[in-house]
């Protein structure tokens, strides 16, 4: 096979020729001649005369000697002396530029260099004495810009903008910025466009996209924060790169040829990183999933595939699996993709069930599914399970915690009078136990559906979707009398997520600045694990148990929690009995675990106080509205 011309010659180690190596090295040596920064620094390419008069030249000569002696010690008298010299001149801003041009490091400004010191000092003088800038003409402003345009020092650039009134000559600077853009200085041009308020002069493919391509997302976001008119089209453009049949690089390859000196990161120009950027920008700027259809499609496909894997591992029961799939497979493309995925996974009976349920055209189905349906008919070929049939044997179901209260103690609250009675009873309690269930959203915020509050004798399942019956005043009363009541201890597990969803979804007006009446059992459990020899509980030592709620239940109560209904359609009304029992057990088990720890751990009160003291829901994400 012919070798490509750009491939390296493979020479075994030790057989290299010194002469050949020297020739290769010499051919790669380049001498770069730095052009005098004064050349073409003025308006219309005029040169800048940086010649110092005799007095200024003598001062600068002596000052350079002092700088070389004292600069590393950062002696404050240097800045004072230099400032006095500038103030003694009739045009301090112009003198500073001349001295800057005579600095040996003026073509390569560093933060601790003499050239940086000169401009930084004159800018600070201007800040203290604004009248110094009154005589600054456009040519002086242009010279100042040309001196610092490629420094990359944002603080210095912004100081020069104010001291030398660069915003007054923005129209003259725009062609200069485009020259920098042609030379591949995307970062510098973006910073200048933001500082000079010129973001509207560039389109999204000139700055925003190349910044993404070189992995400068924070700067791209800062640019979009100012270029408000580009946010929506840019997010739509990035979403268009998330094609289900073509790669990101393939879709934007024709665009990359227009950029010069662009060091592209091929990592970011791939599906997963680009999808994260689309999701981040859409969330930041408040765009709904209608703006990002490609991202929503691929994200939903992945979620549907995940649901089947969870069902296959018996982590979801059949009813939960099918009702959640019915909600999220909302269009023809998602449905056909899901049926094809099931067929490729060998789940032919389930694929045929959804083929029938979705009423999919046979030509859109995999060949094996179409063949089975045509031979046996949809009903016979599928042989699907009844939604009421569980896939776990009775011996395995005995492992799970069951409800120990009668049905009349499981109270569904979806009317105003029921809510009032519940509120009265809750105010009599010293400790209550909280949990919540929400409907998973693929791209947006999760929808709170049920709030569970358990007491010693009842479990209240509050319907958070009963908006007509339960109004804002009901939720405010619940927040004021229960959640913000310091005399009622609220016990939960991983309460950050629950409180965050509650804050966002309901007008409870929670006051979480001093959450000393909340106890997170997860924090309590982790504190117990810090004990040197652990803590013995009725069914094991805490150090041999995991950190999930089902692990606490097993160690304290001897039974696990059946999570097969956790991921189900909690927005469906009425709820299935299995959902009601699952939600009630989740809250009830908190009380049983709490009581067990109180009884079996002699030093539990000290651990509780320590756990409560560590609460910081505001920092962790439960934001106050």
Swiss-Prot record:
Database matches in InterPro entries: 3'-5'_exonuclease_dom, Exonuclease_MUT-7-like, Mut-7_DEDDy_dom, RNaseH-like_sf, RNaseH_sf
Entry keyword annotation includes Magnesium: yes
A GO cellular-component term linked to this record: ribonucleoprotein complex
All copies of domain 3'-5' exonuclease, residue ranges: 410-602
Keywords, ordered alphabetically: Exonuclease, Hydrolase, Magnesium, Metal-binding, Nuclease, Phosphoprotein
Annotated GO MF terms: 3'-5' exonuclease activity; 3'-5'-exoribonuclease activity involved in mature miRNA 3'-end processing; 3'-5'-RNA exonuclease activity; metal ion binding; nucleic acid binding
GO BP terms: miRNA processing; piRNA processing; pre-miRNA 3'-end processing; primary piRNA processing; secondary piRNA processing; transposable element silencing
Residues found modified as Phosphoserine: 17
Top-level taxon in the UniProt lineage: Eukaryota
The keyword Nuclease belongs to this UniProt entry's keyword annotation: yes
Family assignment from sequence similarity: Belongs to the mut-7 family.
Known function: Possesses 3'-5' exoribonuclease activity. Required for 3'-end trimming of AGO1-bound miRNAs, in particular multiple-isoform miRNAs, which represents a critical step in miRNA maturation.
Quaternary data: Interacts with AGO1; the interaction is not RNA dependent.
Full protein name: Exonuclease mut-7 homolog
